[in-house]
Amino acid sequence: MRLQTLVLAALAAVAAAVPAAAATVRVTVTKLTFEPAQVSAHVGDTIEWVNADFLAHSATDRKKEWDLFIAPNKSVHVTVTKPDEIDYYCRFHPNMVGHISVTP
């Protein structure tokens, strides 16, 4: 009985130590908007912007941690590394805004 308890405790510890798989959160740039404009992610996830527009755009963090140029019909990405509330915009079209909520 004691061995069974030790084995179960060891398995629980290993399961708790395995991190969840990182996800990719996609934002499409189209018609001078970010779609969706608000997304949620976890630390370690990747945010991918896909420019489906015929114009160049950017995804520029208002805190100046990143500034990504997005050519027409191309994509760019950033991996979020800490819990945060991130507001971003397109520096070519400042009315284009988005928000990323990053949780642990």
Q: Language-model segments: which ranges?
A:
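Extracytoplasmic copper-binding redox domains, predominantly the cupredoxin/blue-copper superfamily
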Residues: 2-13, 18-104
